[in-house]
Every structure is written in C-alpha cells, then in structure tokens.
A protein has these predicted regions:
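Walker A/P-loop
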Residues: 33-55
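Conserved phosphoryl-transfer catalytic core
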Residues: 176, 180-237, 241-244
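Pre-Walker A (Motif I) flank of P-loop NTPase domains
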Residues: 32-39, 69, 143, 319-320
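A substrate-engagement module of RecA-like helicase motors
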Residues: 2-10, 15, 44, 60-145, ...
C-alpha cells in the first residue's frame, strides 16, 4: 500500500527535510506489516520528533475503527522532552514527579513526607495530587503521550501495560542510551528503612518477609556474580505471591473505605514496583551481582546484561517499538544488547545530507578511573 497521502496530510510542516519522508514511510510500512522493532539511524537535524508524531497519526488513521492506537514517546533528557512539547502542542506529557509541587507541602509524590501525609489522612492523591492526576490521564486517556525513560522502565506492567493503559507503539528517542538506563533502573534494592510506610499499612509481619528474603543471601559476598538458582527463585516467588496477595487486599480495602485511600494507593504503587523488580531478578535467566548487603537490612542486586531485563523494563508493556538515534553505531550489536531477534526487526540507515568533510569526529583522550 502507498501511504504517501496519509503522510502528507499529517506531516506538521510545509516541507520535508532530506530523508524524512522516506523514514516515515519505512516505519509505517513495517509497523503495518507487523514488525515488532523498527531500528532507525537518523542523522542529527533530520527532525526525529516530526517523524515520531507523524508515524503516530498515520498509524492512528490506518487503525481507525480497528483499535484505539496509542503511542508513547520516551526520552532520556528533560531538554528533549521540552523540544517535543515545543514542536507539537497535542502531545500529553508526564514529567518526573519532582516537577509537580505538592499542594500539601509534603514533597513530591511517593516521598517519605508524602507517604506520612497520606497515612495521616491529609491527602487523597486522586483528588489533590497534580502528579497522580496527570499520570492517570497520561496512562488511561492520552493517545499521543510523552514521558521520561526512567518512568517507562520503572513503572510496573500492571500500571502502564494492561488493556486500559497499554501503548500500541513506543518510540525510544536517543535509543543509544537505553541500555544503560535499563540496567540502572532494573537494579533490585531492598532497604528495610524504605519499608516504614508499607509497614504502617500492611503490618510488621508482612514487611518481615522482606528481611527474610535479604537473609537468603547471607552466604554470598558483595561483588559475587550468580544466576538465581531454584532455591532463590522459590524464595522470590513466595515473596512475590505475598506481595500480590497484600496488594489485592489493599485494593479491596481502598474500594470499601474512603479514609486513608491516599496512603493505600501509594503503598499499592510501591508493592507493584517490588513485585516487578523481584520477578525481573528471579526469572530473567541472566547473571546478577550483589552490589551491597547488610544482614536483615539491605540488599542491592544489579543485572550484568541489558537483554536479561529488557522484557520487564520495556517489551512487556507495549506491542511495537521504534528505536531512533543518530548514533546506534552498529545494528547487529544493538540487537544483541537489546535482545532483539532479527526476524522481528526492520532497519533503516538514513543518509546524512551534510558532506563527510563537514562532519569531523574528535576522539577525547580520556579514560574512566576510580580513586
């Protein structure tokens, strides 16, 4: 099929930059064909934001009457997020929670003071919290939505990947940075100090399960590399099941009573996050490192490879993906890092309209060192 008319109708500017229209057509054609991943190495200045938004609108028109097409665009920097908002006024943006001042002067959503305020009945996020309300519109109603990479990775699948909230397409801008972000945010950190707000709502016996899980690693040293064995998987599964049960009980409690609803909602969010992180750790099939351990107090586990955590971080939450960057620097290596099967991918390397002699590359004479 020829999608040229759709592209012309939805492109936001009078003229296309060199290679821009071809990139849009390539993405749309392969999305319609069912490719799960579209890898696009696009030169700086081509206009990636217009490519992303035009692809969304063309796909929405193609799918009209068949499905409610939703696109999530994720960026690694606040500056790039602002650029998207400047270029397209119809995008609905969710920023980091620190960007939403609290009307109760209790810090950002999910902070210790916020949880204390909610626990005391001083706030109901659904009616009083700008971040919470914006997040709900973003995930449930916005069909062209924008957020930061951190939120997309850290948000549990039940929050942004269920039937009500799931995006049809996720556009990963500056995708050359996504592997580091995935490893960073996939780290499993259990700190008993952080469980105080959960304990007030869920009880001491419940939070004691976390300390017991920490102690399952007492025989290992910090810096130890390992693959979760059957015993660790069993321990993690028991904790996940306990978390799921408690979250279900709290959701029912929230429905039955308006008092304390805010604190319960915050705790449910935390519990969902724990369950997602634990599942990613125990059942990803990859190697992990014990970064930090303190008996019955703290445990930090970090994945060794990106591909072992990418499903929980990204792929389980959406159906199709566009990976865009000016510096992918090798499609095969990127696919290996990101756990992408060649049969599921289409790639395009758009030519740079700027002559090579005007694009010098400078090598920085620097290395990383530790003190």
């Amino acid at each position: 099929l020829n999608y040229e008319k759709y592209i012309d109708d939805h492109f936001p500017f009078e003229k296309f930059n060199p290679g821009q229209k071809e990139a849009i057509d390539f993405a749309v054609t392969n999305l319609v064909a069912g490719k799960k991943h579209i890898l696009m190495e696009l030169p700086t200045g081509i206009g990636k934001s217009a490519i992303a938004t035009t692809v969304h609108r063309v796909m929405r028109q193609i799918k009209k009457g068949k499905e409610n097409w939703k696109t999530a665009i994720i960026t690694a920097t606040k500056g790039l997020q602002e650029q998207y908002l400047h270029d397209d006024k119809e995008i609905f943006s969710l920023k980091g929670r620190q960007n939403y001042p609290c009307s109760k002067n209790a810090g950002h959503y999910g902070s210790a003071k916020c949880k204390q305020t909610c626990n005391a009945g001083g706030c109901v996020p659904a009616s009083s919290c700008d971040y919470f309300k914006t997040r709900e519109v973003w995930r449930l109603h916005a069909d062209l939505r924008l957020t930061n990479t951190s939120f997309q990775i850290k948000a549990p699948t039940v929050l942004i990947g269920d039937d009500k909230s799931r995006a049809s397409l996720t556009v990963i801008d500056e995708c050359h940075e996504i592997d580091e972000q995935l490893v960073k945010h996939a780290a499993l950190t259990i700190d008993v100090v952080d469980l105080t707000s959960i304990e007030k709502v869920a009880g001491k016996n419940f939070t004691g399960r976390f300390a017991a899980f920490i102690n399952d690693f007492s025989e290992y040293d910090e810096g130890f590399y390992f693959v979760p064995d059957a015993d660790i998987q069993k321990s993690a599964k028991e904790l996940i099941d306990a978390i799921d049960t408690k979250a279900g009980e709290l959701e029912q409690k929230a429905k039955e009573s308006s008092h304390g609803h805010g604190s319960i909602a915050a705790v449910i969010d935390d519990l969902r996050g724990w369950a997602t992180a634990l599942h990613s750790f125990a059942f990803s099939g990859g190697e992990w490192i014990i970064e930090e351990y303190a008996y019955a107090q703290k445990l930090v586990l970090t994945p060794v490879y990106t591909h072992q955590v990418v499903n929980k971080g990204l792929y389980d939450k959406c159906d199709q993906f566009i990976h865009m960057s000016a510096t992918i620097c090798g499609f095969d290596e990127y696919m290996k890092t990101m756990g992408i099967d060649k049969k599921d991918v289409a790639v395009i390397d758009a030519a740079n309209p700027i002559p090579v002699e005007q694009r010098p590359v400078y090598a920085m004479n620097a290395i990383k060192v530790s003190g």
